[in-house]
Amino acid sequence: MYRALENAFNATGISWAECHREDRGDGLMVMAPSRAPKSLFVELFPHAVAAELRAHNATRPVEQQIRLRLALHAGEVVFDAHGVAGAAVDLTFRLLDAPVLKQALAESPGVLAMVTSGWFFEEVVRNSPVADPAAYSRVRVAVKGTTTIAWISRPDRPYPGDHESGATVTMTATSSDSGRVYQAARDQ
């Protein structure tokens, strides 16, 4: 998982070395530098992660294959001697633990299910010239005392009927480590 994420971050122009990372046992919390454009996380990053996971899985037996839930949010955090804390971190983990996200991945033949906070969807997804808001499904999340609206996407296996029509906008990123090229496009 670490190698796939490192390659995906680097391929999208976000230096893995500059990201704060904390192993959380069965998962990983990664915080990108604040200067990293949030739009990359909905335009290129999901496609890069999915491609890296598929490449990993193609060379592994079924029991070693990886499918991933990914939560996206932005906000203020506090660093202390024990790591990172704050309401933004709490919300991100509530989104990640949401049964509806687990169900989205379980029902998908793909390798990635992604959830964004309501704020991230409204401010980043809707304002991106590449990300397709129609590829996201609005859901209600209620986990550990947190109730909120979130948006789920399955970047490598969209929900049926998720598309818009019109002109095409394309972005490309190349991973110097793996040599793979990732492309994201949106019909507008």
Which residues does each predicted region cover?
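Catalytic NTP-binding/metal-coordinating core of nucleotidyl cyclase/transferase enzymes
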Residues: M1-L40
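A generic structural signal for well-ordered coil/turn residues at beta-strand boundaries
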Residues: R24, G110, T146-T148
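Catalytic beta-strand-to-alpha-helix segment of the class III nucleotidyl cyclase homology domain
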Residues: R35-V139
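Residues in well-ordered beta-strands of folded domains
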Residues: H73, V115-S117, R140-A142, S153, ...
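A broadly conserved detector of short glycine/acidic/proline-rich loop/turn motifs that flank catalytic sites
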Residues: G118-F120, D156, D187
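Intrinsically disordered, low-complexity terminal regions enriched in charged/polar residues
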Residues: P129-G166
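Long, low-complexity intrinsically disordered regions enriched in small/polar
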Residues: G161-Q188
